[in-house]
Design a protein with these regions (language model features):
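Conserved S-adenosyl-L-methionine
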Residues: 91-94, 102-194
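Non-catalytic, mostly N-terminal accessory regions of nucleic-acid modification and defense proteins
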Residues: 1-115, 121-124, 176, 190, ...
């Protein structure tokens, strides 16, 4: 079983959604590859080239994969060249748990509005733990430990009104930030937040 979210499927379900996921919020253009991993594919795949829907669908539909599904050689190469490492879920749980312990006494609305930033987020495991970034095993909703996951779990436990529920969900996303330079990892992070 794969934990990858198919860009091909995203494009078919909503071409606009894929374009949104590929948009650089600063330049208003598409995000760049920012990695040499794909440049052997030719024009359009250099580190400074922009990632367009046609570069991740069709012939290239399975090009971008989570780290756990990349070859060991590719994992090692990206670690060596870009210092790309991935934190195992048990460590994310422990570190986020320390912060969570400081926040658990807050009322729900204040808790939801606490801003969190995951810098150099990779696939964003500190935000959302859809799967273990090391093993690739999918993690059930109730066991996810990212800071967005924890906020969503608390809303699910404490809110029964549907309108309030959805408003608070939007607030969670408005208060959650991740920064990533490499375009493929950024796209994976954004997909994980869906």
């Amino acid at each position: 079983m794969t934990i990858d979210i198919s860009e091909e499927s995203l494009s078919k379900e909503s071409a606009d959604l894929l374009k949104i996921l590929l948009k650089d919020r600063t330049t208003k253009k598409s995000i760049v590859w920012a990695t040499h991993s794909y440049e052997l594919l030719g024009k359009g795949f250099a580190p400074s080239d922009r990632i367009t829907p046609s570069r991740v669908t069709g012939t290239y539909a399975n090009l971008i994969q989570p780290r756990s599904e990349k070859s060991k050689y590719e994992q090692k190469d990206r670690t060596k060249i870009r210092a790309e490492v991935f934190t195992p879920t048990w460590l994310v749980e422990k570190q986020n748990g320390y912060v969570e312990a400081e926040l658990e006494a807050m009322d729900l609305e204040d808790y939801i509005q606490v801003s969190w930033l995951e810098i150099t987020c990779g696939e964003a495991p500190y935000m959302v733990t859809r799967y273990d970034t090391v093993t690739g095993e999918e993690i059930p909703l109730s066991e996810r430990v990212g800071f967005v996951d924890r906020k969503l779990q608390r809303i699910s436990r404490e809110v029964s009104d549907e309108v309030t529920f959805y408003e608070l969900i939007k607030e969670v996303y408005r208060a959650s930030y991740g920064y990533e330079y490499q375009g493929d990892s950024l796209l994976l992070a954004r997909e994980n937040l869906l």
